[in-house]
Amino acid sequence: KTTTTTTLLLLLALTFNAWGQTKEMSINPEESSIHWLAKKVTGQHDGTIKITSGSLTMQNDLISGGNFEVDMTSIFVSDLNGEYKQKLEGHLKSDDFFSVDKFPKANLLIKETRQKMPNHYEINADLTIKGITNPVSFEMHIEDNVAMSKLIIDRSKFDVRYGSNSFFENLGDKTIYDDFEIDVTLKF
């Protein structure tokens, strides 16, 4: 009976080991960064936004999931100063754009991952902005407790309409392109 019990325990241990270890890697929000870039017919603007919390789920040392929260009230414009900077930050936070009083947080939930090569992943996730969730796909590189990604987000899918040719005609040089870029650096 002792041999049977020992054998059973050994098989269970091997089975659990084969399933692999799952661990959560929490980000350090102070050392992580999100840089955004939005373009219009006559130029572009860029800035930052703060990530408040998040983690990657690792299975057998491979990314298997993750969840991140962004503070939309922290929208910061880097390319302007003074009055113009304040006006643009206020406008981006208004109902014309991201309605941060109603929707102070944005979330990204990783749904699927595929390793393309060591430390490089293709990620499928759900992004929620203004209470609207849409799928997004992007690539992520992770090495030495740092993950980096670039996402292209179509703002029109999140009801961010101001200056968009998707919703308004004859905007001419007042058009703001629907796609904007975010460069993300996460430190764990």
Predicted regions and their residues:
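Bacterial N-terminal signal peptides
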Residues: T6-N17
